[in-house]
Amino acid sequence: MSNQYQEEGCSERPECKSKSPTLLSSYCIDSILGRRSPCKMRLLGAAQSLPAPLASRTDQEKAMQGSPKGSSAPFEAELHLPPKLRRLYGPGGGRLLQGAAAAAAAAAAAAAAAATATGTAGPRGEVPPPPPPAARPGERQDSAGAVAAAAAAAWDTLKISQAPQVSISRSKSYRENGAPFVPPPPALDELGGPGGVAHPEERLSAASGPGSAPAAGGGTGTEEDEEELLEDEEDEDEEEELLEDDEEELLEDDARALLKEPRRCSVATTGTVAAAAAAAAAAAAVATEGGELSPKEELLLHPEDAEGKDGEDSVCLSAGSDSEEGLLKRKQRRYRTTFTSYQLEELERAFQKTHYPDVFTREELAMRLDLTEARVQVWFQNRRAKWRKREKAGAQTHPPGLPFPGPLSATHPLSPYLDASPFPPHHPALDSAWTAAAAAAAAAFPSLPPPPGSASLPPSGAPLGLSTFLGAAVFRHPAFISPAFGRLFSTMAPLTSASTAAALLRQPTPAVEGAVASGALADPATAAADRRASSIAALRLKAKEHAAQLTQLNILPGTSTGKEVC
């Protein structure tokens, strides 16, 4: 039988002798790695045990059904061909043109490398043309003709099996996408019915890549693998539901969690020995027999893609659409909490008080805002990260001595303007602020004399608005004491309270006295700012408190100072 098979195969395909050593060398990597090699089975004479009527019967069944599963498929085990490709390109499958066009994207790299692997020129290494008439067993009904047709079909489809295992990195997606679709137990898939009719779902469940094509009597191992894969995917779904509680963590934690689960699936499916074999097989970029990801493929596949394929999306023929659809499914399953404006206001108010609320504060906030405590905790983590990012960006964009974006502290650069001296010297950190203020004043009032020393001030890179001056202590500068500035402030209203600015600037002398008196109040205020977390929100709150204190100071001595002004 094997001699007849070799002779008829050679008569049908004259170039088969040049192919045989190529076939042997293309699978030498698999034999080194200890995997079942279909070439080894062929050389050992696996075809001898099959009589000619049985071979012709299975060949005719394959021709009628176009199915990858028969009751006993000798050539399928030898050909080492994925059932998905076998259905499209096998004898009787018709090698449909639309199937070839759809699979062209997945086999683009394999087509170019197949010509190199087979060692033959011409159409042997390319995407297969329509089948020759020798591959249709319906025309030959006798036993020898059927065997010859089977040999021709075997050699005809060998060029797909000899392609280097580059395009097989998607085999896990076929396996995982197809496995949850199977309504009956997988044993029914392997045995098949007496008529041998296989459903499309069963074809999908078998499409795990060339490494998992079962040998004769190797069906039970594949069944156990599929059952283990189903259980592992259910475990993955439960773990993903648990992971969604912390989905809005920082990005590095999220990526770590995504990378963790595909590795867990890989180890759970195979055990330590097969995992070591998978690590060795990564050099050849082939999938191991269980059809799981090798470590190299885990790095190549997007982590969200690998985790997101939970069998809910259908099998895609091209590799690009496969990853996109898995990613889309992943995005649909993950949800984000949308906070109302009231919830955000309350959370911001709590964040102003403390950046690190204890568990009681978080639970109280969660009860009040109708949120879970985990959501409140995640919001505070994200808010702290955003605050640190802004602080870092503020420290980079502003010079270190410029006080306005930074927090209030005991050594605030405004401290020289809070002492009792009526005309203190310039503080170098405020030079750009004075330049901006003088430029705005000169534009509004050309008759206003410039402040002393303004000609020697450095030009400001970005003019700061007058609203950055946080209190009346800044007005100790001589330019702010002239009455003309009162009209400027009353038109622009730069402070948080416009009435405070007008009251301070209508009477310049009480402004000086109020600023001097507020110097005594500066120490407890800055101590309170130190107790609070030093954030931008705390800075705004501090400015409001300072303006309120100055208003009270201006009202209390208002009668006596009014007489002095008159």
From Swiss-Prot:
Ranges of biased composition (kind: Acidic residues): 222-252
Residue window of motif OAR: 534-547
Compositional bias (Pro residues): 126-135
Compositionally biased region (Basic and acidic residues): 253-264, 294-312
Pfam family, one: Homeodomain
Record's keyword annotation contains Transcription regulation: yes
Gene Ontology biological process terms from the UniProt entry: axon guidance; cell proliferation in forebrain; cerebral cortex GABAergic interneuron migration; cerebral cortex tangential migration; embryonic olfactory bulb interneuron precursor migration; epithelial cell fate commitment; forebrain development; globus pallidus development
Localization terms from the record: Nucleus
GO cellular component: nucleus
Region (Disordered): 1-21, 50-79, 119-264, 286-319
Biased composition range(s): Low complexity: 144-154, 205-215
Segments of skewed composition (Polar residues): 159-171
InterPro entries: HD, Homeobox_CS, Homeodomain-like_sf, OAR_dom, Paired_Homeobox_TFs
Top-level taxonomic group: Eukaryota
CDD domains: homeodomain
Annotated function: Transcription factor. Binds to specific sequence motif 5'-TAATTA-3' in regulatory elements of target genes, such as histone demethylase KDM5C. Positively modulates transcription of KDM5C. Activates expression of KDM5C synergistically with histone lysine demethylase PHF8 and perhaps in competition with transcription regulator ZNF711; synergy may be related to enrichment of histone H3K4me3 in regulatory elements. Required for normal brain development. Plays a role in neuronal proliferation, interneuronal migration and differentiation in the embryonic forebrain.
Family: Belongs to the paired homeobox family. Bicoid subfamily.
The protein's name: Homeobox protein ARX
UniProt source species: Rattus norvegicus (Rat)
